[in-house]
């Protein structure tokens, strides 16, 4: 069945001469590379044919001709003639017109201006999710379409840019190649990105075509959703809002919990709040207190916080609820927008309730001005009061007024129509619309028709036309084939002559389908998690198909990330949308019409409602553990097979939820196809487990692991639930130590979440697998899942590394002794010892590029450790001709992530700052700019103009003396402090300019002035740190005093002949020694650099990095430069590792560059001996670690902790105060960090810090490790007290809690620190265990 809706009739009045009848109709718009069709109809009864000259021409604004096409045509009597013009591909913007001239004695001349449409392509963007967490990967597709929704043949690539919330370019693809009109790629979001709304934009030929946003934020995907709606439509007279609250898991089952409801009235002030227990659905009434409305409707705000039972997971919903003064509204439904004087005018008052249902029984008085109409009446069962009014010939306006007995009032004016005829023609659909099927239309006219003309328009052109002769009938059955050319939308126009008037009607055809009839279906609507699902696709053979599936819960954030049927309709309408024009109806159809001089087109008005044409749419077993909990999946491209179909089998994730599956297809000939709406299916089990596990616990603590069981089988069953002791990592409290599993039984009624818990202790540090299985009905229904929680040490881990570097130019044999420095107070069982042989200096750096520093990196300078080492590694790999493409790819990818991270700290003036929006820093801008310039060799995302702007800003900060001083805050005193005449910072800035080829030329004067300043200061430089950077700057500049500076620097060095090491003793000795090594390399003193390298490699961390950012940056740079000169191609040696009475052998040749590891060294080993014999070079490393109780640290900060009384067992408020203890009066630390770790079971929310002191404000805050740690950053600390309060909440039950700690330290000198432990509630096992878990001592 299909429904008819009355269509409006368009009447064109044409004054016709006695012997003339000609109509020319054509599109009003032209586009490049598109067909243009003109239709000429001859209804001249005297001439058997007319001859015409058609001329299509165009010129630019300055008169240059861009189009000139002519055609001679003849049109026979009572016939149509369709004339096609093919527009050239290179058609450009200009002034276009078509001219029609009569020939061979036929007098006719008409012109029509045509509008050039430049938009010939459009774009769409699809993203796999609307919101992303830090560290996620963004998958996206760009789709380009032409006016026929096909891949544009002339566009081969696009320019794609991704920008962060500050509009910094994070990634760009300058020539993103299209396949079937699609470009697909991804972006790895870094773990510490700029949070907010990001943007993907697509450009073609320099113009933006389409863009889309997505959000990056910290979030937890809710397992359930809450809906809040009025139980009844609220009215002022009710003085209350009645709400229905529904809470359901995404897989459809009800949620049990507590709903906290808050009502806000005028000025958004809290009016009242209530709490109610809800199981799936609940209702609550919130009564007003004398609520008075100023208008017919007013919004109030309702906030509902729903807290799930057992887990405390919370969903917050806010709703605007409209309160109405009256229970109904009214609308005037008119036969036509205007009335005709002297003819009956039918209309009706339509009364509806605010939920859309008819409002019957509404009584009131109806009055109509100017016609003397007045009556009291009541709305019928359809909510209608029907009126038939009789306007006279002199009536100009009808004023329709309604007054109800309850005070409701309505008024509307209706104007008369300006017309000279009562004739009209009507087009009605008599059949469904189906592709390649006949459509039947009934054409009805008030006059007998000798002929009528029909036109079919689609995609901006006339695709069909016909001249019909109904033999003087008033009705005619028109049959047209629904061709593919009409899809997806078309218009049909009919016209005839009635007396001296041409009347016409038109209708819209919406096929609700596309030429590429793509279809997608799945074999099951409900499936168990982790099982296979079969997708069936059909469409055009060989067509591209893009698939995506995502968790329905993501739609709570946004749904604009995906592609929907409505998006395609908007793209199509964007090409072909026409502005309505009541004075030119042909223009409203995208056409123009021209006829003879004595025929006049008058404005047309509607006489009846329109018919909207309806579309043709028809009305004991092996248990697998669930470990895959993706939020989006099935991001896949496939092709339709030759048969026009394709099947695909995929494994669904292990999440129990509802999924949305979407798909589209593109064919070069038939264009785009997309499914009408996403396919929704549910992953659910008849019986399943939901976990609520903590992020981390400490070894030895007694922890309650909480699970919830769900049973959808309709009857109550006894469930056996087993927790496994995987790899002997777990101890079951109150059970024998040898138990490998623990099984409990619990009764599980249907459709109710039943909690069950296990009390355990973790035996080992690291990751602990939590594996649980539950079964009912003797194992016929089972579920099992496995997740990992982190087991943290009770003490603080102390990593150590001893190294020795050897470089043998000829065959040698040497023994290297290693004595392990393990603290006597180290915790028992915490020692780990490893030997590592590294034939390549940078191998470990490459392996650990994504995790070089364990310390926080939450400011603009520290963050560079995620960027700079990748540049150095790439420099090394390319310099040594490495064939390790996977290493190059890894470093390049991490380089992009580091760049993405760093753009958070770019300031509006082009410089860089230590914090977001904190102001500029000379030091950091120099550091970043030179690094990005170097990085641009390996990634094209870096904007050269951005680097140039930073260097320009830098150059503008030079003092007239040539010196540079820091403009921003000082957090690295030796570099920025301005002490010792600012030599260090001036040298640092000069190195940045000298290492940039463009800046070196552009700012040559700045460099020269700076070098003059340094050379004048050289004799007075007595600090090794200052001299090392100044010497390196002189080396880069090729300054005449570079040798003098290097000799002076060497004189300041310290040599250790026993270890064959050289270094410079100062507060920044790693950085100083690294700059010295860079100068050695530039002076080609490679052999002299070996002892310096020996010392540097002994300062490295396990990861291959150095303790801090600048150490790592300069240290790796220096080692890289020397390593490029020393090739491992001659390596050929044997290494003997001796410990206790054991010996282990390693043989190394030039083919081996990977690290050799040996882990099986007993923890009681105190001494190792390593012998190397052969030729070549390598690095010997002994890595060891032990845990040390937190009380064994010396303090250089004063740190005080105070637990505040909250009155709740579930809330922790900790007051933290710290200040620096100076050795000299008024001295201060460098950048200082305070890290607060929380006791097991406690986590913070998004804004945990309050009551902070403002004398020395907190600059940045990071929440780490799943909310179990908070890091605060200060520019520096002095003797002032720096205090704040951190608030955390207990989410999990833990007994025998280990103490937590707070640590404060100087980032650039970690020897300056303080650490304090604190404890919260001292619960014992008996207080948190359930009866069957409790050990024997609890039962006494």
Swiss-Prot record:
InterPro entries: A-macroglobulin_rcpt-bd, A-macroglobulin_rcpt-bd_sf, A2M/Complement_sys, A2M_N_BRD, A2M_TED, Alpha-macroglob_thiol-ester_cl, Alpha-macroglobulin_TED, Ig-like_fold
Keywords per UniProt: Disulfide bond, Glycoprotein, Immunity, Secreted, Signal, Thioester bond
GO molecular function term, any single one: endopeptidase inhibitor activity
Gene Ontology CC annotations of this record: extracellular space
Superkingdom field: Eukaryota
Chain residue numbers at which the record places covalent cross-link Isoglutamyl cysteine thioester (Cys-Gln): 859-862
Identification of the protein by name: Thioester-containing protein 1 allele S1
Signal sequence region: 1-21
Source organism (scientific name): Anopheles gambiae (African malaria mosquito)
Any one GO BP annotation for this protein: positive regulation of opsonization
Subunit structure of this chain's protein: Heterodimer of a TEP1-N chain and an TEP1-C chain non-covalently linked. Forms a complex composed of TEP1-N and TEP1-C heterodimer, LRIM1 and APL1C; the interaction stabilizes TEP1-N and TEP1-C heterodimer, prevents its binding to tissues while circulating in the hemolymph and protects the thioester bond from hydrolysis. Mature TEP1 and to a lesser extent full-length TEP1 interact with SPCLIP1; the interaction is induced by microbial infection.
PTM note: In the hemolymph, the full-length protein is cleaved by an unknow protease into a 75kDa N-terminal (TEP1-N) chain and an 80kDa C-terminal (TEP1-C) chain which remain non-covalently linked. The TEP1-C chain contains the thioester bond which covalently binds to the pathogen surface. Cleavage is induced by bacterial infection or aseptic wound injury. During embryonic and pupal development, the cleaved form is the predominant form.
Induction: By bacterium E.coli infection.
Glycan-carrying positions: 68, 199, 242, 312, 481, 637, 728, 813, 828
Keyword Signal attached: yes
Its biological purpose: Plays an essential role in the innate immune response to bacteria and protozoa infection. After proteolytic cleavage, the protein C-terminus binds covalently through a thioester bond to the pathogen surface resulting in pathogen clearance either by melanization or lysis. Initiate the recruitment and activation of a cascade of proteases, mostly of CLIP-domain serine proteases, which leads to the proteolytic cleavage of the prophenoloxidase (PPO) into active phenoloxidase (PO), the rate-limiting enzyme in melanin biosynthesis.
């Amino acid at each position: 069945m299909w429904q008819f809706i009355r269509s409006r009739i368009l009447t064109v009045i044409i004054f016709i001469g006695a012997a003339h009848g000609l109509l020319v109709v054509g599109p009003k718009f032209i586009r490049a590379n598109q067909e243009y069709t003109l239709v000429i109809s001859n209804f001249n009864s005297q001439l058997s044919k007319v001859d015409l000259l058609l001329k299509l021409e165009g010129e630019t604004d300055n008169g240059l001709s861009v189009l000139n096409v002519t055609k001679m045509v003849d049109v026979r009597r009572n016939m149509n003639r369709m004339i096609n013009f093919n527009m050239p591909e290179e058609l450009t913007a200009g002034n276009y017109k078509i001219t029609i001239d009569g020939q061979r004695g036929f007098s006719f001349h008409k012109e029509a201006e045509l509008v050039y449409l430049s938009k010939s392509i459009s774009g769409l963007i699809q993203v796999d999710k609307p919101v992303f967490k830090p560290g996620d990967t963004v998958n996206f597709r760009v789709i380009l379409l032409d006016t026929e929704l096909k891949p544009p043949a002339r566009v081969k690539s696009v320019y794609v840019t991704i920008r962060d919330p500050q509009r910094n370019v994070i990634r760009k693809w300058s020539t993103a190649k299209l396949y079937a009109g699609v470009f697909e790629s991804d972006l790895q979001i870094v773990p510490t990105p700029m949070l907010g709304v990001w943007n993907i934009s697509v450009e073609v030929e320099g113009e933006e075509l389409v863009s889309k946003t997505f959000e990056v934020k910290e979030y937890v995907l809710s397992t359930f959703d809450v809906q809040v709606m009025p139980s009844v439509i609220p009215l002022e007279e009710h003085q209350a809002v009645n709400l229905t609250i529904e809470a359901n898991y995404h897989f459809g089952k009800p949620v049990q919990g507590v709903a906290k409801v808050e009502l806000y009235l005028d000025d958004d002030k809290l009016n009242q709040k209530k709490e109610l227990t809800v199981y799936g659905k609940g209702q609550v009434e919130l009564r007003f207190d004398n609520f008075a409305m100023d208008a017919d409707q007013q919004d109030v705000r309702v906030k509902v916080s729903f807290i799930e039972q057992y887990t405390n997971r919370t969903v917050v919903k806010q709703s605007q609820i409209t309160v109405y003064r009256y229970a109904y509204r009214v609308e005037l439904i008119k036969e036509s927008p205007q009335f005709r004087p002297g003819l009956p005018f039918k209309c009706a008052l339509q009364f509806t309730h605010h939920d859309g249902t008819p409002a019957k029984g509404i009584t009131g008085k109806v009055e109509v001005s100017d016609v003397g109409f007045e009556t009291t009446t009541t709305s019928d069962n359809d909510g209608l009061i029907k009126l038939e009014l009789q306007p006279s010939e002199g009536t100009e306006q009808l004023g329709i007024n309604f007054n109800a007995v309850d005070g409701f009032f309505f008024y509307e004016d209706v104007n008369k129509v300006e017309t000279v005829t009562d004739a009209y023609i009507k087009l009605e659909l008599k059949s469904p619309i189906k592709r390649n099927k006949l459509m039947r239309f009934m054409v009805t006219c008030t006059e007998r028709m000798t002929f009528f003309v029909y036109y079919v328009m689609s995609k901006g052109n006339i695709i069909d036309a016909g001249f019909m002769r109904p033999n003087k009938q008033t009705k005619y059955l028109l049959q047209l084939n629904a061709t593919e050319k009409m899809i997806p939308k078309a218009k049909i126009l009919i016209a005839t002559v009635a007396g001296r008037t041409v009347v016409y009607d038109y209708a819209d055809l919406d096929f609700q389908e596309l030429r590429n009839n793509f279809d997608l279906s799945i074999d099951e609507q409900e499936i168990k998690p982790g099982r296979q699902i079969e997708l069936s696709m059909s469409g055009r053979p060989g067509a591209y198909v893009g698939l995506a599936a995502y968790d329905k819960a993501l739609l709570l954030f946004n749904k604009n990330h995906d592609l929907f049927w409505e998006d395609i309709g908007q793209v199509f309408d964007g090409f072909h949308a026409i502005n309505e024009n009541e004075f030119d109806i042909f223009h409203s159809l995208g056409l123009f019409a021209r006829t003879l001089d004595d025929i006049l087109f008058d404005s047309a008005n509607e006489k009846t409602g329109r018919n909207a044409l309806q579309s043709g749419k028809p009305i004991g077993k092996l248990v697998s553990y669930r470990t895959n909990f993706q939020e989006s999946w099935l991001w896949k491209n496939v092709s339709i097979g030759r048969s026009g179909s394709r099947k695909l089998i995929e494994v669904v994730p292990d999440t129990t939820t509802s999924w949305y599956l979407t798909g589209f297809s593109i064919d070069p000939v038939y264009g785009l196809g997309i499914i009408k709406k996403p396919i929704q299916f549910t992953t659910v089990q008849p019986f399943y487990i939901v976990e609520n596990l903590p992020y981390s616990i400490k070894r030895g603590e007694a922890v309650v692991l909480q699970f919830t069981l769900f049973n959808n089988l309709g009857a109550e069953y006894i469930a056996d639930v087993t927790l496994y002791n995987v790899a002997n990592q777990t101890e079951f409290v109150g059970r024998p130590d040898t138990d490998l599993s623990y099984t409990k039984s619990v009764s599980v009624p249907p459709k109710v979440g039943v909690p069950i818990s296990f009390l355990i202790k973790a035996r080992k540090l690291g990751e602990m697998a939590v594996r649980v299985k539950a079964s009912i009905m003797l194992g016929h229904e089972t579920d099992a899942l496995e997740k990992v929680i982190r087991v943290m040490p009770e003490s603080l881990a102390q990593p150590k590394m001893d190294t020795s570097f050897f470089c043998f130019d000829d065959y040698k044999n040497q023994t290297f002794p290693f004595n392990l420095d393990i603290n006597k107070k180290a915790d028992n069982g915490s020692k780990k010892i490893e030997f590592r042989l590294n034939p390549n200096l940078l191998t470990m750096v490459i392996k650990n590029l994504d995790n070089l520093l364990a310390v926080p990196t939450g400011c603009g300078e520290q963050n560079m450790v995620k960027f700079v080492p990748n540049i150095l590694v790439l420099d090394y790999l390319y310099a040594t001709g490495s064939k390790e493409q996977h290493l190059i790819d890894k470093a390049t990818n991490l380089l992009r992530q580091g760049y993405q991270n760093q753009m958070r700290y770019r300031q509006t003036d082009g410089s860089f700052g230590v914090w977001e929006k904190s102001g500029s820093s000379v030091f950091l801008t120099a550091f970043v700019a030179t690094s990005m310039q170097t990085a641009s060799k390996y990634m094209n995302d870096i904007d050269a103009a951005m680097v140039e702007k930073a260097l320009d800003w830098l150059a503008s900060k030079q003092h007239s003396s040539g010196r540079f001083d820091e403009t921003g805050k000082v957090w690295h005193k030796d570099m920025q402090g301005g002490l010792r005449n600012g030599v260090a910072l001036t040298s640092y800035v000069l190195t940045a300019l000298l290492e940039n080829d463009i800046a070196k030329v552009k700012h040559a004067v700045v460099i020269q002035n700076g070098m003059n300043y340094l050379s004048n200061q050289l004799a007075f430089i007595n600090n090794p740190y200052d001299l090392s950077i100044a010497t390196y700057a002189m080396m880069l500049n090729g300054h005449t005093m570079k040798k003098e500076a290097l000799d002076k620097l060497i004189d300041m060095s310290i040599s250790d002949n026993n270890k064959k090491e050289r270094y410079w003793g100062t507060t920044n000795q790693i950085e100083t020694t690294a700059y010295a090594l860079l100068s050695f390399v530039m002076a080609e003193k490679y052999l002299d650099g070996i002892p310096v390298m020996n010392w540097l490699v002994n300062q490295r961390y396990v990861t291959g990095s150095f303790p801090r950012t600048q150490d790592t940056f300069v240290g790796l740079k220096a080692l890289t430069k020397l390593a490029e000169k020393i090739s491992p191609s001659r390596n050929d040696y044997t290494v003997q590792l001796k410990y206790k009475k054991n010996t282990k052998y390693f043989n190394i040749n030039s083919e081996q560059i990977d690290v050799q590891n040996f882990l099986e060294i007993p923890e009681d080993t105190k001494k190792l001996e390593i012998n190397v014999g052969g030729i070549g070079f390598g690095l010997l490393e002994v890595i060891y670690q032990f845990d040390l109780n937190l009380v064994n640290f010396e303090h250089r900060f004063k740190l005080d902790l105070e637990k505040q009384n909250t009155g709740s067992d579930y809330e922790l408020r900790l007051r933290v105060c710290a200040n620096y203890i100076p050795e000299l009066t008024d001295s201060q630390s460098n950048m200082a960090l305070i890290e607060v770790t929380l006791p097991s079971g406690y986590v913070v929310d998004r804004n945990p810090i309050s009551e902070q002191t403002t004398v020395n404000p907190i600059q940045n805050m990071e929440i780490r490790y799943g909310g179990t740690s908070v890091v605060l950053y200060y520019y520096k600390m002095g003797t002032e007290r720096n205090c704040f309060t951190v608030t955390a909440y207990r989410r999990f039950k833990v007994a025998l809690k280990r103490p937590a700690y707070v640590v404060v330290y100087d980032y650039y000198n970690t020897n300056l620190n303080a650490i304090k432990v604190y404890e919260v509630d001292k619960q014992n096992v008996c207080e948190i265990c359930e009866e069957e878990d409790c050990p024997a001592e609890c039962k006494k």
